[in-house]
């Protein structure tokens, strides 16, 4: 059973009576948690006055595995080209990522032998970012308003400058918080993916008929197909040749 125990300085997220995470309070703001389904809550933070900046932070216990869907899996750490590695840049600044980089908007996930925890944006159209980094207090899940990428941005094989967006001041900020007990396995993010699919899913009407889509698909593939004089054949799909 999950409970939220509030005090003046923080909200404790408790499982079977023991704290597994904590949510630091924000000055001049009130937090509320509305159950959506088992293990999932809509977290709403209302401020006394409109503001154009907010960080909604959940500090979980030390993690055995972390993930930012589509960006970082266990901290990455492979490859020879520029890549987001670990939870911080070389100068010690925690990475922050714009919502659109992640396959679930501004989503961060961590797990240990007691629980799995995820935090992400409630509205994909909100200007948000996320950060996931370890401190002595635990694993910090942060939903950031407005969108930003710090301390630098990863472009196509090179680093760019930091980015900080803007947003209209508001007095209401929303997030989705997921907490599930451990079943003893690892990489237990399937419930997160399943919920996100249901939560964000919506019907899409095909812009053209099935026959026309098939015709266009074949035409596009033929356009990309190339055969060289030495017999090599392949599809040009945006890949680049890098010498060396």
Language model features: what each stretch is:
Residues 1-244:
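Carbohydrate-recognition beta-sandwich/jelly-roll modules
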